[in-house]
Amino acid sequence: MKISKMDMSPMLNAYPDSVENNIEGMLGFLQKEEAQDIFGSFYILPSIFNTDLDRGFSIIDYNLNEIYATENDLDKLKELGINLKFDFVLNHASVLSKQFQDIIKKGQESEYKDFFINWNKFWEGKGEMTEEGYIQPYPELIQKMFFRKPGLPILMVRMPNGENVPYWNTFYQEVRYDKVQEQDLMQALQLQYLTALEIAKMVNDQLEKGVIPANVELGRFEKYKKQVVEYVESHRKYLGQMDLNIKSPLVWEYYDDTLRTLAEYGAKIVRLDAFAYAPKEPGEKNFLNEPGTWNLLERIQQLADKYELTLLPEIHSSYEEKTYEILSQKGYMAYDFFLPGLIIDAFEEQSGEMLEKWAQEILDKQINVVNMLGCHDGIPLLDLKGLIKDEQIQRLIDTVVGRGGFVKNLHGQKNVYYQVNATYYSALGEDDRKMLISRAVQLFMPGKPQVWYLDLFAGKNDYEAVRRAGAGGHKEINRTNLSMEDIEEALKKDVVMTQLKLLRFRKNFPAFEKMNNIKIQAVG
Protein backbone atom coordinates (compact mmCIF):
# COMPACT_ATOMS: atom_id res chain seq x y z
CA MET A 1 0.00 0.00 0.00
CA LYS A 2 1.28 3.43 -0.83
CA ILE A 3 0.91 5.97 1.93
CA SER A 4 -2.62 6.28 3.28
CA LYS A 5 -3.15 6.74 7.00
CA MET A 6 0.35 6.52 8.37
CA ASP A 7 1.09 5.95 12.03
CA MET A 8 3.15 9.06 12.84
CA SER A 9 4.21 8.04 16.35
CA PRO A 10 7.92 7.96 17.31
CA MET A 11 9.93 4.99 16.07
CA LEU A 12 12.81 3.50 18.03
CA ASN A 13 15.81 2.35 15.97
CA ALA A 14 18.46 -0.13 17.11
CA TYR A 15 20.26 -3.35 16.33
CA PRO A 16 18.74 -6.44 17.92
CA ASP A 17 21.80 -6.69 20.16
CA SER A 18 22.10 -2.99 21.07
CA VAL A 19 20.92 -3.65 24.64
CA GLU A 20 22.06 -6.71 26.58
CA ASN A 21 23.04 -8.38 23.29
CA ASN A 22 19.53 -9.43 22.21
CA ILE A 23 15.99 -8.15 21.66
CA GLU A 24 15.04 -9.31 25.13
CA GLY A 25 17.35 -6.60 26.49
CA MET A 26 15.59 -3.85 24.55
CA LEU A 27 12.25 -5.31 25.66
CA GLY A 28 13.48 -4.89 29.22
CA PHE A 29 13.93 -1.17 28.59
CA LEU A 30 10.62 -0.75 26.75
CA GLN A 31 8.77 -2.43 29.61
CA LYS A 32 10.17 0.04 32.13
CA GLU A 33 7.82 2.67 33.50
CA GLU A 34 10.04 5.44 32.09
CA ALA A 35 9.61 4.05 28.55
CA GLN A 36 5.88 3.39 28.65
CA ASP A 37 3.67 4.85 25.93
CA ILE A 38 6.53 6.49 24.02
CA PHE A 39 7.20 4.44 20.89
CA GLY A 40 4.61 3.22 18.41
CA SER A 41 7.15 1.59 16.08
CA PHE A 42 10.53 -0.12 16.30
CA TYR A 43 12.96 -0.30 13.39
CA ILE A 44 15.10 -3.35 14.06
CA LEU A 45 18.19 -3.52 11.86
CA PRO A 46 18.67 -6.64 9.72
CA SER A 47 21.09 -8.56 11.90
CA ILE A 48 17.83 -9.82 13.42
CA PHE A 49 17.81 -12.17 10.40
CA ASN A 50 20.18 -14.95 9.37
CA THR A 51 23.12 -12.85 8.15
CA ASP A 52 26.89 -13.04 7.88
CA LEU A 53 28.43 -9.61 7.08
CA ASP A 54 27.99 -5.85 7.11
CA ARG A 55 26.24 -5.85 10.50
CA GLY A 56 23.22 -7.56 8.95
CA PHE A 57 23.05 -6.22 5.40
CA SER A 58 24.36 -9.44 3.85
CA ILE A 59 21.34 -11.67 4.27
CA ILE A 60 21.49 -15.46 4.02
CA ASP A 61 17.74 -15.74 4.58
CA TYR A 62 15.02 -13.93 6.51
CA ASN A 63 14.65 -16.48 9.28
CA LEU A 64 15.11 -14.92 12.70
CA ASN A 65 18.65 -15.04 14.06
CA GLU A 66 18.16 -17.29 17.07
CA ILE A 67 21.08 -15.62 18.86
CA TYR A 68 19.22 -12.31 18.93
CA ALA A 69 15.48 -12.86 18.70
CA THR A 70 12.55 -15.26 18.80
CA GLU A 71 9.00 -14.94 17.52
CA ASN A 72 7.97 -14.72 21.17
CA ASP A 73 10.08 -11.55 21.48
CA LEU A 74 8.27 -10.04 18.50
CA ASP A 75 4.92 -11.01 20.01
CA LYS A 76 5.86 -9.15 23.20
CA LEU A 77 6.58 -6.03 21.15
CA LYS A 78 3.13 -6.32 19.59
CA GLU A 79 1.62 -6.63 23.09
CA LEU A 80 3.27 -3.28 23.92
CA GLY A 81 1.46 -1.75 20.95
CA ILE A 82 4.65 -1.47 18.91
CA ASN A 83 4.64 -2.26 15.20
CA LEU A 84 7.82 -3.06 13.33
CA LYS A 85 9.96 -1.77 10.51
CA PHE A 86 12.37 -4.15 8.82
CA ASP A 87 14.89 -4.02 6.00
CA PHE A 88 14.39 -5.75 2.67
CA VAL A 89 17.65 -5.87 0.70
CA LEU A 90 16.58 -5.81 -2.95
CA ASN A 91 19.90 -5.74 -4.77
CA HIS A 92 21.80 -8.63 -3.28
CA ALA A 93 21.95 -11.71 -1.08
CA SER A 94 24.78 -13.46 0.71
CA VAL A 95 27.12 -15.89 -1.01
CA LEU A 96 25.98 -18.26 1.76
CA SER A 97 22.33 -18.09 0.67
CA LYS A 98 20.87 -21.43 -0.38
CA GLN A 99 20.49 -20.11 -3.92
CA PHE A 100 24.15 -19.21 -4.41
CA GLN A 101 25.40 -22.30 -2.62
CA ASP A 102 23.30 -24.39 -4.99
CA ILE A 103 25.08 -22.74 -7.94
CA ILE A 104 28.48 -23.50 -6.41
CA LYS A 105 27.43 -27.11 -5.86
CA LYS A 106 25.63 -27.81 -9.15
CA GLY A 107 26.90 -25.19 -11.60
CA GLN A 108 24.76 -24.89 -14.72
CA GLU A 109 22.55 -27.72 -13.46
CA SER A 110 21.32 -25.50 -10.61
CA GLU A 111 17.74 -24.27 -10.79
CA TYR A 112 19.14 -20.96 -9.52
CA LYS A 113 21.71 -20.51 -12.31
CA ASP A 114 20.01 -17.27 -13.39
CA PHE A 115 19.08 -16.07 -9.88
CA PHE A 116 22.26 -13.99 -9.74
CA ILE A 117 23.90 -12.00 -12.55
CA ASN A 118 26.43 -13.93 -14.60
CA TRP A 119 28.72 -11.09 -15.69
CA ASN A 120 29.73 -12.70 -18.97
CA LYS A 121 26.14 -13.42 -19.98
CA PHE A 122 25.16 -9.84 -19.16
CA TRP A 123 27.97 -8.35 -21.28
CA GLU A 124 27.99 -10.96 -24.06
CA GLY A 125 28.74 -9.24 -27.37
CA LYS A 126 29.46 -5.96 -25.59
CA GLY A 127 33.13 -6.34 -24.71
CA GLU A 128 36.33 -8.37 -25.04
CA MET A 129 37.11 -11.59 -23.18
CA THR A 130 40.19 -11.26 -20.94
CA GLU A 131 42.80 -13.88 -20.09
CA GLU A 132 41.31 -14.00 -16.60
CA GLY A 133 38.02 -15.26 -18.00
CA TYR A 134 35.74 -12.25 -17.68
CA ILE A 135 34.47 -9.83 -20.32
CA GLN A 136 35.91 -6.33 -20.21
CA PRO A 137 33.00 -4.16 -21.44
CA TYR A 138 33.62 -1.63 -24.17
CA PRO A 139 34.65 1.70 -22.59
CA GLU A 140 31.65 3.61 -23.92
CA LEU A 141 29.33 1.16 -22.14
CA ILE A 142 30.80 1.65 -18.68
CA GLN A 143 31.90 5.28 -18.76
CA LYS A 144 28.72 6.33 -16.92
CA MET A 145 28.72 3.35 -14.57
CA PHE A 146 28.75 3.97 -10.82
CA PHE A 147 31.36 1.88 -8.99
CA ARG A 148 31.41 1.40 -5.21
CA LYS A 149 34.94 -0.01 -5.23
CA PRO A 150 37.99 -0.03 -7.51
CA GLY A 151 37.91 -2.33 -10.54
CA LEU A 152 34.99 -4.17 -12.07
CA PRO A 153 32.28 -5.37 -9.66
CA ILE A 154 32.84 -9.10 -10.13
CA LEU A 155 33.64 -12.16 -8.06
CA MET A 156 35.15 -15.15 -9.86
CA VAL A 157 33.31 -18.24 -8.66
CA ARG A 158 34.56 -21.77 -9.23
CA MET A 159 32.04 -24.19 -10.69
CA PRO A 160 32.03 -27.97 -10.04
CA ASN A 161 33.73 -28.58 -13.41
CA GLY A 162 36.62 -26.29 -12.44
CA GLU A 163 35.49 -23.36 -14.59
CA ASN A 164 35.71 -19.88 -13.05
CA VAL A 165 32.58 -17.83 -13.73
CA PRO A 166 32.36 -14.09 -12.96
CA TYR A 167 29.28 -12.94 -11.04
CA TRP A 168 28.19 -9.33 -10.49
CA ASN A 169 29.22 -8.20 -7.02
CA THR A 170 28.56 -4.52 -6.27
CA PHE A 171 29.37 -4.64 -2.57
CA TYR A 172 31.67 -6.71 -0.35
CA GLN A 173 33.60 -9.79 -1.41
CA GLU A 174 36.21 -12.02 0.14
CA VAL A 175 37.85 -15.23 -1.07
CA ARG A 176 39.19 -17.58 1.58
CA TYR A 177 41.33 -20.69 1.45
CA ASP A 178 41.16 -23.21 4.25
CA LYS A 179 44.37 -24.55 5.74
CA VAL A 180 45.54 -27.59 3.82
CA GLN A 181 45.55 -30.75 5.95
CA GLU A 182 48.32 -33.18 5.09
CA GLN A 183 46.14 -36.28 5.38
CA ASP A 184 43.54 -34.85 3.01
CA LEU A 185 46.27 -33.81 0.57
CA MET A 186 47.89 -37.25 0.78
CA GLN A 187 44.62 -39.00 -0.09
CA ALA A 188 43.54 -36.55 -2.80
CA LEU A 189 46.87 -36.47 -4.65
CA GLN A 190 48.10 -39.98 -3.75
CA LEU A 191 51.23 -38.58 -2.08
CA GLN A 192 53.54 -40.06 0.50
CA TYR A 193 52.69 -38.82 3.98
CA LEU A 194 55.89 -36.83 4.65
CA THR A 195 55.71 -35.27 1.19
CA ALA A 196 52.11 -34.19 1.85
CA LEU A 197 53.13 -32.86 5.27
CA GLU A 198 55.90 -30.69 3.83
CA ILE A 199 53.79 -29.41 0.92
CA ALA A 200 50.90 -28.57 3.26
CA LYS A 201 53.24 -26.53 5.47
CA MET A 202 54.69 -24.64 2.50
CA VAL A 203 51.25 -23.89 1.05
CA ASN A 204 49.76 -22.79 4.37
CA ASP A 205 52.69 -20.49 5.15
CA GLN A 206 52.32 -18.73 1.80
CA LEU A 207 48.52 -18.51 1.91
CA GLU A 208 48.78 -16.81 5.31
CA LYS A 209 51.03 -14.19 3.71
CA GLY A 210 48.41 -13.46 1.04
CA VAL A 211 50.01 -15.38 -1.83
CA ILE A 212 47.34 -16.64 -4.23
CA PRO A 213 47.42 -20.39 -4.95
CA ALA A 214 48.66 -19.95 -8.54
CA ASN A 215 51.78 -18.15 -7.24
CA VAL A 216 52.65 -20.60 -4.48
CA GLU A 217 56.24 -21.88 -4.73
CA LEU A 218 56.83 -25.54 -3.85
CA GLY A 219 60.61 -25.80 -4.29
CA ARG A 220 61.67 -29.40 -4.88
CA PHE A 221 58.00 -30.41 -5.03
CA GLU A 222 57.27 -28.12 -7.99
CA LYS A 223 56.23 -31.13 -10.09
CA TYR A 224 53.10 -31.39 -7.94
CA LYS A 225 52.18 -27.72 -8.29
CA LYS A 226 49.38 -28.09 -10.84
CA GLN A 227 47.67 -30.76 -8.74
CA VAL A 228 48.19 -28.81 -5.51
CA VAL A 229 46.80 -25.58 -6.97
CA GLU A 230 43.79 -27.47 -8.33
CA TYR A 231 43.21 -29.03 -4.91
CA VAL A 232 43.44 -25.70 -3.06
CA GLU A 233 41.18 -23.90 -5.54
CA SER A 234 38.59 -26.67 -5.37
CA HIS A 235 38.22 -25.92 -1.64
CA ARG A 236 37.83 -22.17 -2.11
CA LYS A 237 35.35 -20.41 0.22
CA TYR A 238 33.62 -17.06 -0.26
CA LEU A 239 32.05 -14.25 1.67
CA GLY A 240 30.18 -11.49 -0.06
CA GLN A 241 26.97 -9.94 -1.32
CA MET A 242 25.97 -11.12 -4.78
CA ASP A 243 23.70 -9.05 -7.02
CA LEU A 244 20.30 -10.53 -7.83
CA ASN A 245 19.02 -10.85 -11.38
CA ILE A 246 15.68 -9.05 -11.26
CA LYS A 247 14.81 -10.48 -14.69
CA SER A 248 14.59 -13.97 -13.16
CA PRO A 249 11.07 -15.17 -12.17
CA LEU A 250 12.64 -16.97 -9.21
CA VAL A 251 13.91 -13.66 -7.83
CA TRP A 252 10.37 -12.31 -7.88
CA GLU A 253 9.14 -15.41 -6.04
CA TYR A 254 11.87 -14.70 -3.49
CA TYR A 255 10.76 -11.06 -3.21
CA ASP A 256 7.14 -12.09 -2.62
CA ASP A 257 8.09 -14.70 -0.04
CA THR A 258 10.29 -12.19 1.80
CA LEU A 259 7.58 -9.54 2.04
CA ARG A 260 5.10 -12.11 3.30
CA THR A 261 7.59 -13.22 5.97
CA LEU A 262 8.23 -9.66 7.14
CA ALA A 263 4.49 -8.99 7.40
CA GLU A 264 4.04 -12.15 9.46
CA TYR A 265 6.74 -10.90 11.86
CA GLY A 266 4.66 -7.76 12.43
CA ALA A 267 6.15 -5.32 9.92
CA LYS A 268 4.13 -2.29 8.87
CA ILE A 269 7.00 -0.42 7.19
CA VAL A 270 9.63 -2.05 4.97
CA ARG A 271 12.81 -0.13 4.22
CA LEU A 272 14.07 -0.94 0.75
CA ASP A 273 17.84 -1.13 1.03
CA ALA A 274 20.11 -0.79 -2.02
CA PHE A 275 17.10 -0.80 -4.36
CA ALA A 276 18.69 1.76 -6.69
CA TYR A 277 21.48 -0.67 -7.64
CA ALA A 278 19.14 -3.50 -8.70
CA PRO A 279 18.07 -2.46 -12.25
CA LYS A 280 21.00 -2.89 -14.62
CA GLU A 281 21.42 -2.25 -18.34
CA PRO A 282 24.55 -1.99 -20.55
CA GLY A 283 25.60 1.62 -21.03
CA GLU A 284 23.67 2.92 -18.02
CA LYS A 285 24.93 4.28 -14.71
CA ASN A 286 23.41 1.22 -13.03
CA PHE A 287 22.44 3.30 -10.05
CA LEU A 288 18.96 4.79 -10.09
CA ASN A 289 18.47 3.88 -13.75
CA GLU A 290 15.38 5.36 -15.33
CA PRO A 291 12.78 4.08 -15.93
CA GLY A 292 14.05 0.76 -14.57
CA THR A 293 14.20 1.89 -10.94
CA TRP A 294 10.63 3.14 -10.94
CA ASN A 295 9.37 0.03 -12.74
CA LEU A 296 11.06 -2.08 -10.08
CA LEU A 297 9.48 -0.10 -7.25
CA GLU A 298 6.04 -0.34 -8.84
CA ARG A 299 6.30 -4.13 -9.05
CA ILE A 300 7.53 -4.34 -5.46
CA GLN A 301 4.63 -2.09 -4.44
CA GLN A 302 2.15 -4.51 -6.02
CA LEU A 303 3.60 -7.30 -3.88
CA ALA A 304 3.66 -5.14 -0.74
CA ASP A 305 0.00 -4.20 -1.21
CA LYS A 306 -0.98 -7.84 -0.67
CA TYR A 307 0.50 -7.68 2.83
CA GLU A 308 -0.55 -4.10 3.69
CA LEU A 309 3.04 -2.92 3.91
CA THR A 310 4.25 0.67 3.49
CA LEU A 311 7.48 0.90 1.50
CA LEU A 312 10.27 3.27 2.47
CA PRO A 313 12.88 3.38 -0.32
CA GLU A 314 16.29 4.31 1.08
CA ILE A 315 18.60 6.37 -1.08
CA HIS A 316 21.24 9.01 -0.42
CA SER A 317 21.38 11.77 -2.99
CA SER A 318 21.94 15.49 -2.81
CA TYR A 319 19.13 17.98 -2.29
CA GLU A 320 19.77 19.45 -5.73
CA GLU A 321 19.04 16.09 -7.40
CA LYS A 322 15.49 16.18 -5.95
CA THR A 323 15.25 12.38 -5.63
CA TYR A 324 13.23 12.81 -2.43
CA GLU A 325 10.69 14.85 -4.39
CA ILE A 326 10.41 12.27 -7.17
CA LEU A 327 9.80 9.52 -4.59
CA SER A 328 7.08 11.62 -3.01
CA GLN A 329 5.44 12.39 -6.35
CA LYS A 330 5.29 8.67 -7.04
CA GLY A 331 3.51 8.10 -3.74
CA TYR A 332 6.35 6.76 -1.59
CA MET A 333 7.67 7.83 1.77
CA ALA A 334 11.15 9.32 1.75
CA TYR A 335 13.91 9.73 4.29
CA ASP A 336 14.60 13.24 5.50
CA PHE A 337 18.37 12.99 5.37
CA PHE A 338 18.70 16.78 5.40
CA LEU A 339 17.42 17.43 8.93
CA PRO A 340 20.46 16.14 10.92
CA GLY A 341 22.88 18.45 9.13
CA LEU A 342 20.49 21.40 9.03
CA ILE A 343 20.09 21.35 12.81
CA ILE A 344 23.85 21.38 13.38
CA ASP A 345 24.15 24.11 10.74
CA ALA A 346 21.48 26.18 12.55
CA PHE A 347 23.51 26.04 15.76
CA GLU A 348 26.76 26.90 14.01
CA GLU A 349 25.32 29.70 11.85
CA GLN A 350 23.01 30.96 14.63
CA SER A 351 20.13 30.95 12.15
CA GLY A 352 17.03 28.83 11.66
CA GLU A 353 16.42 30.15 8.15
CA MET A 354 17.35 26.96 6.28
CA LEU A 355 15.42 24.77 8.72
CA GLU A 356 12.37 26.93 8.14
CA LYS A 357 12.82 26.74 4.37
CA TRP A 358 13.09 22.94 4.40
CA ALA A 359 10.15 22.43 6.76
CA GLN A 360 7.99 24.68 4.60
CA GLU A 361 8.97 22.74 1.48
CA ILE A 362 7.91 19.47 3.13
CA LEU A 363 4.51 20.99 3.87
CA ASP A 364 4.03 22.76 0.56
CA LYS A 365 4.93 19.71 -1.52
CA GLN A 366 3.21 17.28 0.88
CA ILE A 367 6.31 15.12 1.19
CA ASN A 368 5.83 12.19 3.57
CA VAL A 369 9.09 11.62 5.42
CA VAL A 370 10.73 9.64 8.16
CA ASN A 371 13.20 11.95 9.90
CA MET A 372 16.01 11.35 12.36
CA LEU A 373 19.02 12.81 14.12
CA GLY A 374 21.47 9.91 14.26
CA CYS A 375 21.22 6.43 12.78
CA HIS A 376 23.30 3.26 12.29
CA ASP A 377 25.25 5.02 9.52
CA GLY A 378 26.86 8.43 9.72
CA ILE A 379 25.53 11.98 9.54
CA PRO A 380 24.79 12.58 5.82
CA LEU A 381 26.19 16.06 5.35
CA LEU A 382 26.87 15.74 1.61
CA ASP A 383 23.13 15.29 1.05
CA LEU A 384 22.81 19.02 1.82
CA LYS A 385 24.48 20.01 -1.45
CA GLY A 386 22.18 22.46 -3.20
CA LEU A 387 20.31 23.35 -0.03
CA ILE A 388 23.16 25.15 1.72
CA LYS A 389 26.43 26.47 0.33
CA ASP A 390 29.34 24.10 -0.26
CA GLU A 391 31.46 26.16 2.15
CA GLN A 392 28.88 25.59 4.88
CA ILE A 393 28.91 21.85 4.24
CA GLN A 394 32.69 21.81 4.56
CA ARG A 395 32.48 23.82 7.78
CA LEU A 396 29.99 21.29 9.14
CA ILE A 397 32.32 18.41 8.25
CA ASP A 398 35.24 20.23 9.90
CA THR A 399 33.11 20.96 12.98
CA VAL A 400 31.99 17.37 13.50
CA VAL A 401 35.49 16.02 12.83
CA GLY A 402 36.86 18.63 15.23
CA ARG A 403 34.55 17.18 17.87
CA GLY A 404 35.98 13.71 17.37
CA GLY A 405 34.07 12.39 14.36
CA PHE A 406 35.53 10.35 11.52
CA VAL A 407 35.22 10.60 7.77
CA LYS A 408 35.93 7.98 5.15
CA ASN A 409 36.84 8.73 1.55
CA LEU A 410 33.98 7.80 -0.76
CA HIS A 411 34.92 4.79 -2.91
CA GLY A 412 38.58 5.81 -2.85
CA GLN A 413 37.93 9.38 -3.96
CA LYS A 414 40.04 11.64 -1.76
CA ASN A 415 38.21 14.49 -0.05
CA VAL A 416 34.77 13.23 -1.15
CA TYR A 417 32.91 12.21 1.99
CA TYR A 418 29.69 10.25 1.96
CA GLN A 419 28.96 10.62 5.65
CA VAL A 420 30.63 11.78 8.83
CA ASN A 421 30.67 9.20 11.59
CA ALA A 422 29.93 10.36 15.12
CA THR A 423 27.18 10.06 17.68
CA TYR A 424 24.79 12.95 17.27
CA TYR A 425 25.40 13.97 20.88
CA SER A 426 29.15 14.21 20.27
CA ALA A 427 28.56 16.02 16.96
CA LEU A 428 26.74 18.67 19.02
CA GLY A 429 29.77 19.04 21.27
CA GLU A 430 28.18 16.82 23.97
CA ASP A 431 25.98 19.73 24.94
CA ASP A 432 22.79 18.64 26.75
CA ARG A 433 20.89 21.79 25.84
CA LYS A 434 21.68 21.42 22.14
CA MET A 435 20.66 17.76 22.29
CA LEU A 436 17.27 18.63 23.77
CA ILE A 437 16.67 21.46 21.31
CA SER A 438 17.61 19.12 18.45
CA ARG A 439 15.16 16.49 19.66
CA ALA A 440 12.40 19.07 20.10
CA VAL A 441 12.98 20.41 16.58
CA GLN A 442 12.86 16.88 15.18
CA LEU A 443 9.61 16.07 16.97
CA PHE A 444 7.88 19.21 15.74
CA MET A 445 9.07 18.78 12.15
CA PRO A 446 6.64 17.22 9.67
CA GLY A 447 7.17 13.47 9.44
CA LYS A 448 7.49 10.32 11.46
CA PRO A 449 10.40 10.69 13.93
CA GLN A 450 12.92 7.86 14.08
CA VAL A 451 15.08 7.76 17.24
CA TRP A 452 18.50 6.11 17.29
CA TYR A 453 18.83 4.41 20.67
CA LEU A 454 22.27 5.89 21.37
CA ASP A 455 21.00 9.45 20.81
CA LEU A 456 18.23 8.80 23.32
CA PHE A 457 20.81 7.91 25.96
CA ALA A 458 23.16 10.77 25.01
CA GLY A 459 25.81 8.35 23.80
CA LYS A 460 29.33 9.61 23.19
CA ASN A 461 31.79 8.67 20.44
CA ASP A 462 33.02 5.12 21.10
CA TYR A 463 36.67 5.12 20.06
CA GLU A 464 37.36 1.76 21.71
CA ALA A 465 34.72 0.13 19.50
CA VAL A 466 36.39 1.64 16.42
CA ARG A 467 39.76 0.30 17.57
CA ARG A 468 38.35 -3.19 18.15
CA ALA A 469 36.69 -3.21 14.73
CA GLY A 470 39.97 -2.48 12.92
CA ALA A 471 40.20 -1.24 9.33
CA GLY A 472 36.87 0.03 8.07
CA GLY A 473 35.39 0.04 11.55
CA HIS A 474 34.71 3.79 11.70
CA LYS A 475 30.93 3.32 11.90
CA GLU A 476 31.25 1.51 15.22
CA ILE A 477 31.81 4.92 16.81
CA ASN A 478 28.01 5.21 16.99
CA ARG A 479 26.98 1.60 17.70
CA THR A 480 27.87 1.03 21.34
CA ASN A 481 26.12 -1.97 22.86
CA LEU A 482 24.57 -1.05 26.20
CA SER A 483 23.98 -3.06 29.34
CA MET A 484 20.91 -2.62 31.51
CA GLU A 485 23.21 -0.97 34.04
CA ASP A 486 24.19 1.58 31.38
CA ILE A 487 20.53 2.34 30.79
CA GLU A 488 19.77 2.63 34.51
CA GLU A 489 22.55 5.20 34.82
CA ALA A 490 21.36 7.07 31.73
CA LEU A 491 17.82 7.30 33.13
CA LYS A 492 19.21 9.41 35.96
CA LYS A 493 20.22 12.15 33.51
CA ASP A 494 17.99 15.11 32.69
CA VAL A 495 19.01 15.00 29.02
CA VAL A 496 17.59 11.48 28.78
CA MET A 497 14.46 11.92 30.87
CA THR A 498 13.52 15.15 29.10
CA GLN A 499 13.85 13.44 25.73
CA LEU A 500 11.50 10.71 26.96
CA LYS A 501 8.97 13.33 28.09
CA LEU A 502 9.14 15.04 24.70
CA LEU A 503 8.67 11.74 22.92
CA ARG A 504 5.69 10.80 25.08
CA PHE A 505 4.11 14.17 24.29
CA ARG A 506 4.80 13.68 20.57
CA LYS A 507 3.16 10.25 20.60
CA ASN A 508 0.03 11.19 22.50
CA PHE A 509 -0.89 14.77 21.61
CA PRO A 510 -3.67 14.54 18.97
CA ALA A 511 -2.42 17.43 16.83
CA PHE A 512 0.55 15.34 15.68
CA GLU A 513 -1.67 12.72 14.06
CA LYS A 514 -2.13 14.98 11.05
CA MET A 515 0.60 17.55 10.53
CA ASN A 516 -0.61 19.42 7.45
CA ASN A 517 -1.77 22.48 9.42
CA ILE A 518 1.64 23.33 10.85
CA LYS A 519 2.87 26.90 10.61
CA ILE A 520 6.62 27.38 10.45
CA GLN A 521 8.48 30.42 11.68
CA ALA A 522 12.17 30.79 12.41
CA VAL A 523 13.02 33.16 15.25
CA GLY A 524 16.65 34.22 15.23
Where are these regions (language model features)?
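Active-site and adjacent substrate-binding regions of carbohydrate-active enzymes
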Residues: 1-524
